A protein has these predicted regions:
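Short linear sequence motif anchored by a di-proline
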Residues: 1-201
Length: 201
């Protein structure tokens, strides 16, 4: 996916810059460095905070930041149970992942053709995510990281056409996945609401 320009993030989400320079990748791939917005950790009241971290959540039990399995996406229906995500989910460590666009693979021609998704109104995407802070016990280095949440899209008229079909699964049970856009009016609830409130978005 493509992160927005820094000034667009500041304007869209009313969050100030902690650093005068852009410090994330121009185009994001798993394990790259990208921006995310969370509830400010050091503020007594509610504020938004812009952070850069690895796209691929580093769980508390990791031995090193580079994992042997992917954590760039997390199934929303499994957050409360999966070891990698259940603690950030229970603690309310939700974030917004800003995106100008994102790409999904379409296999209707028999080969992968990337489709790019942008909002028709020209606005930026606010994608649902979880974040975690992990400290390397050997070096003391602090790593910020995040994962992008997904939802089943088998009944969505467009998103069900994305991703390679599973030949072993019936046509109506492919478990096609989609990212989860959060509307502007729901951003604060997603960042600071209860788990129950966030689950309804």
């Amino acid at each position: 996916y493509t992160p927005p320009a820094l000034q667009d993030i500041e304007r869209e989400w009313a969050v100030g810059r902690p650093n005068p320079l852009r410090w994330w990748d121009e185009v994001l791939f798993p394990r790259g460095t990208g921006p995310f917005i969370r509830r400010a950790r050091e503020s007594a009241s509610y504020e938004r905070e812009l952070v850069a971290g690895q796209w691929g959540l580093i769980p508390w039990f990791a031995k090193e930041p580079k994992l042997k399995y992917p954590t760039n996406n997390a199934r929303s229906e499994e957050l409360a149970d999966k070891a990698s995500y259940k603690h950030p989910w229970a603690r309310g460590q939700r974030c917004i992942i800003p995106a100008s666009d994102f790409d999904e693979p379409n296999w209707e021609t028999g080969r992968n053709v990337w489709w790019r998704f942008k909002r028709v109104d020209g606005a930026l995407w606010s994608l649902a995510g979880l974040w975690n802070t992990w400290t390397d016990k050997a070096t003391g280095e602090v790593h910020e990281s995040y994962t992008m949440l997904t939802i089943n899209a088998d009944t969505h008229p467009l998103m069900k056409r994305m991703h390679k079909p599973d030949p072993k699964a019936p046509a109506d049970a492919q478990d096609k996945r989609s990212v989860i856009p959060i509307e502007a009016g729901d951003v604060d609830t997603w960042l600071a609401g209860t788990v129950e409130e966030a689950s309804t978005l």
